[in-house]
């Protein structure tokens, strides 16, 4: 017998499932899309144990004809296309005929479906893709699909899945995306028997956005629309005061299909230009309509990516759509708007969404100040040592820390360009970045306090309210105990806010809101161990509380920074990996001046 043999249909389906079905959220996506293609106006989604134990999708769509029940579970069997011409003009969500067969091949699946004017419906069961049961049941209109023990026959796949909480979030994100695509459909989501959300059908997209993300979004959305050259676009973008420090608030749909645009995020940043800080990313909910023959949706197994016939033309259209509204939404020029946005006083700070951040968390510069505006900031005449840690004593900082032999400062000579400390070390000359050096000091100080749980809790005179979406609030409350491990105590306030009443003593009053927002953003959707939480919090505190470029430092403070830096475990890098100092040995200097 030859070595090359044809694979069994079951194995072929399992291999195909590996491309289409990443985890439970992929099953939810495929089944919701089938429901949409069937004309459903109501949909219930249920999951248990992150969808691995159970997934159930129920819709009121047109149902499946009795003679099509069995073929529906076969690979490459579909009612949506017949020839290549149909594929070129496809508008349905699904068209390959892979989803049900792939899902059935890696689960125990039960499919029930009925059509109009029929007294009976049909039920079919399969185990690992093999039909085990088929029977008539009382009639109804629509489809119910039950998926149990996902990946029961592919245990390796189960090993690579994340925690139940992580899988639950992915399912919520999938339903959220589909609910944005179809505001006219009622969605209900239940996880482990608990109602996550009920979204009534809406007459417009904005109401659906508010349903999902919170009432605080309503006043920060700018409506966009443009029609040109066979392209039509509608939707909403956030005003420049309302943004996230990651891209998870950006949703793009083409012909109703949620997709990832190759340069979408880059185009958005370009459209907003300098209206946002470097780490700011706007929200967007954009809906494009285009002749299906001008777009290829068949380039990705999960249909996440698409290809445009005229990509350059689409990118130009995308950019114009955003810039047109940004220009018309304000009476001031872009330059004036930039200066207004990038130079607020502390009193103008406002946080309208959980992940809105009002400073460049990694830029090393003062909040919302661009490089060219730095010289206009009033210079501090001195710097408070308390921001660097408790007292002048180094005992708390140096406990159990071996002094790093590669950086032993002798004396400093001053500061160059209001940023770089010039100092003589034991074996040469050093240039130290005052911001990154203080970041390293603060990072190790806070990390040590967290690891030893050696910090107190101080009440706030005025509690801080943080506006969030309903889902964000639930995510925070689900992680309440984790956050309390780093001294963050957040309680619900209504349906779309949380309140902070006390802070850990390693934070300085006045900086706590931005630190906590940054911390929540960095932990969003991530599984984190206790040491990882400590590391993230220490980085957030260090980044926000460290002295900045341009801060005027007295001689005693300069000496204290150098002394404390020398006791750090890793004095040569800030927590984000940037260098804190550059050193030239005496030999280096003598070679530069040809003395050697």
UniProtKB/Swiss-Prot annotation:
The name this protein goes by in its record: DNA mismatch repair protein MutL
BP GO terms, sorted: mismatch repair
Key word DNA damage present: yes
Similarity comment: Belongs to the DNA mismatch repair MutL/HexB family.
Gene Ontology CC: mismatch repair complex
CDD domains for this protein: HATPase_MutL-MLH-PMS-like, MutL_Trans
Function statement: This protein is involved in the repair of mismatches in DNA. It is required for dam-dependent methyl-directed DNA mismatch repair. May act as a 'molecular matchmaker', a protein that promotes the formation of a stable complex between two or more DNA-binding proteins in an ATP-dependent manner without itself being part of a final effector complex.
Keyword DNA repair (UniProt): yes
Pfam families membership: DNA_mis_repair, HATPase_c_3, MutL_C
GO molecular function, one term: mismatched DNA binding
Natural source organism: Leptospira borgpetersenii serovar Hardjo-bovis (strain JB197)
Entry-linked SUPFAM superfamilies: ATPase domain of HSP90 chaperone/DNA topoisomerase II/histidine kinase, DNA mismatch repair protein MutL, Ribosomal protein S5 domain 2-like
Superkingdom: Bacteria
Gene from which this protein is expressed: mutL
Keyword annotations from UniProtKB, A to Z: DNA damage, DNA repair
InterPro entries referenced in this protein's UniProt entry, alphabetically: DNA_mismatch_repair_CS (IPR014762), DNA_mismatch_repair_MutL (IPR020667), DNA_mismatch_S5_2-like (IPR013507), HATPase_C_sf (IPR036890), MutL/Mlh/PMS (IPR002099), MutL/Mlh/Pms-like (IPR038973), MutL_C (IPR014790), MutL_C_dimsub (IPR042120)
